Amino acid sequence: MAGNSIGQHFRVMTFGESHGIALGCIVDGCPPGLEITEADLQIDLDRRRPGTSLYTTQRREADEVKILSGVFEGKTTGTSIGLLIENTDQRSTDYSDIKDKFRPGHADYTYHQKYGIRDYRGGGRSSARETAMRVAAGAIAKKYLKQEFGVEIRAYLSQMGDVCIDKVDWNEIENNAFFCPDADKVAAFDQLIRDLKKEGDSIGAKIQVVATNLPVGLGEPVFDRLDADIAHALMSINAVKGVEIGDGFDVVQQKGSQHRDPLTPNGFRSNHAGGILGGISTGQDIVASIALKPTSSITVPGDTITRTGEPTQLITKGRHDPCVGIRAVPIAEAMLAIVLMDHLLRHRGQNFAVQTETPKI
């Protein structure tokens, strides 16, 4: 099975399944000398961790990360960093009914057809449980970016169902279980989740992720454009069905005179491009949004087939998120951090001595 790693200079490879013994990852390319502890990684893992509120899955995993290698006396050594999280709250019997059935809207059918075998317990490798290791690796990247370059990466829930935020208060995001920057919308999100639980249904969501204080020049045209790699990373998150950079699909309705971001000696007048032009960072905020589909793990009966092709119905048992978008906020931050870390190291390796007569705005 290929496709388990991302990045070139800063490379992350994950392994493990939803109901396996443990999850793990290897982080290659982290520069030496970065002060890092398990407690540093645990901060973001706790933000993603299941069972922390009434609004997410009640599977209770501590998600306590262990650093196995690559760190000595509290600092990275420049060698491979090994990370491990043990699974402790598996209830595999919840999935015995789907051993020979395919859950509609999930990867059961495609994994079975591709590999001829699948781990049906919680979706196995296709489960969002795998993203715990992305968050752990992303926490390393986030700390390096912030400490060495002042880059900060933050995300928030901007829409759930038909409820959209009206304002962004960065100080409000960590004050509620939804990572919502608009305190006036928290009650509406709360009621929506409660209604969905009664119905046994789920809902989609939109998340915006922003990186600030980024230097100009990151990105490797043409196939490794910064926005292309960001889209690739964000699209790899479970349930993501759409990615926008800057104004995204709204550009369809814009004229060129509206969309272009005029340059002045004091900076850009706007940021419709989301901080990227020609696949290279402008030094403005990197702004991206992702759309996440509603999970198909619901108690509303759905039509499907058995392994032998017989028609049947399925009601999904187990513990699931009524909106997967809530816990995807720290995952989106992690994936953006991994991409930016990789591109920053690539840029530094090739272009560190480049100087121009044009001032950076």
Swiss-Prot record:
Cofactor requirement: FMNH2
Cofactor note: Reduced FMN (FMNH(2)).
Its EC number(s): 4.2.3.5
Record Gene3D superfamilies: Chorismate synthase AroC
Segments traversing the membrane: none
Family the UniProt entry places it in: Belongs to the chorismate synthase family.
Protein's name in the database: Chorismate synthase
Species classification: Bacteria, Pseudomonadati, Pseudomonadota, Gammaproteobacteria, Vibrionales
Gene name of the encoded protein: aroC
